[in-house]
Amino acid sequence: KLPSREENPVRYLSVRYSMPETLVNRWIEDYGEEKTEKILTDFLTEKPITVRCRNHKYPQKEIYESLVDQGVEVKPAPYLPYAYEISNYNHILALDAFIQGKIQVQDVSSMLVAELAAPEAGNKIVDICAAPGGKSLHIAEKLWITDRNEAKKGEVEARDLTEYKVGLIEENIARMELENIHAVCRDATAPDEAWKEKADIVLADLPCSGLGVFGKKPDLKYRVKEE
């Protein structure tokens, strides 16, 4: 039985939506009870996986048919013509389109970064918190397109703090057979004189509280500390 909403709305919402009371209380203070409930409801709503089609290298129709042939449900994602929302499959690693490097798992919000960055031929680009590499890989591909007919070639350096995270980036680079991007283990808080005033574009998706991704990573809500 749920707690009484009238007697204790924080407790009610906490139990109803499986969210620590500390967070519920803070959000009610910030946003009010009605908006907080909408936020909590959204966290429990199943989200589709979004993939980026590498349609500069593979015909998008070919990618679509490969997914459908394996029983995947495919719908266009908003904003970008090369993005699909996919569902009705067991594991991304079992999909031929993924194995063959034709698609990359990536949120539309992440894809928009490369669109806004709009790299130009010969650009030097560094991503200081890159793992698993979605934005770095995407911008490397857009850079490759602009570089194709140019003598001066650009490069992307994808960095992260641990060898494990760098390994994730390297796996994706290898799967997608990209040559204008490399991964480096480096602490973003340490000055790097070698790159001082040399980068044309710097990507910095910095570590944060993770409060906005509880829907995808529900375990985080039990690790958040009040401070």
Residue ranges of model-derived segments:
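S-adenosylmethionine
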Residues: K1-E227
